[in-house]
Amino acid sequence: MRYIEPHGHMVSRTTDDYQAMAMAGCQAVSEPAFWAGFDRSSVQGFYDYFCQLTQHEPRRAAMFGLPHYTWLCINPKESEDLKLADEVLGIIPEFMGSPNVLGIGEIGLNKNSRNELKVLEQHVDLAAQHDQLILVHTPHLEDKHKGTRLILDVIKNDSRINPERVM
């Protein structure tokens, strides 16, 4: 059976996983930026991560005949530090021209905090400024329904965003 992996965090996987996916019929991989299990402490850490997503992972996937696509963002779990978030949002445009970048994501909320909401709004603004697709992340920790409503409201309230370009 042929399929596309819509949400694979391949930076944390081995090449054996790429091989198994290819043998199982995978035709392409889409990898959203995600939390690494710990908070990155600097913009340089994110720069290196974005290089991994836009340069290294496409080469690893290509060894098994798989196109690799990615989404870029600062994950909601790392959005509490507004200074760091601003710095990270500032470098994302450098990577948008990479041929494997699909858009901004996975963005959203985790604890539904004010800082997360502010960074979500900044992500949506960045996507609008650069006409990028948006991939949404719904909350894990707090009220999922409330968080999802907040996310939808942010997207709906930005008239530059076409809802058909949001996943």
Model feature map: region roles:
Residues 1-167:
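Mid-domain alpha/beta scaffold segments of enzyme catalytic cores
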